[in-house]
Amino acid sequence: MKNLTKSIIASVLVAVPAFGLACDYPERPTLPDGSTASKEQMIAAQSSVKAFLAAVDEYLDCIEQEEKDAIAALPEIDESDEDAVTSREAEIKRRDDLLAKRFDAANEEKFLFGEKWNQQVRAYNDRKAEQKP
């Protein structure tokens, strides 16, 4: 029975990552060079930046829901089977740790992308300030 339970859990764990195809990480927009960009280019880029950041948040919501669904889809186990319980708990922890890493990476990219955008905005504003008589 223990081997059957482990086999079922293993087969579900192999199948579950296929569900991950529904959440696509958004493509990062290209930022204009603030030292040469027009006002229109900067305004368009600002819209793209906001859309990208919102899309990353949607991606994070999506992968979080996928993980909840994947954990809920794990097969029922005999709670008296300590090996099965331990195996299931280890799998849930592994998935939680992986989700946390994905969240951290996405939030780090949001931060760094925001910093790059702010650098271009500063370059644009500095150029405009220099052009004033």
Question: Can you say where each PLM-predicted feature lies in the sequence?
Answer:
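Immediate post-signal-peptide N-terminus of mature secreted/exported proteins
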Residues: 19-68
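Compact alpha-helical subdomains of small soluble proteins
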Residues: 74-133
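A ubiquitous, low-specificity "background" feature that marks scattered single residues
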Residues: 9-12, 63-65
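Low-complexity, compositionally biased segments
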Residues: 6, 27, 60, 81-84, ...
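Bacterial N-terminal signal peptides that target proteins for export
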Residues: 1-11
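Hydrophobic h-region of N-terminal signal peptides that target proteins for export
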Residues: 11-20
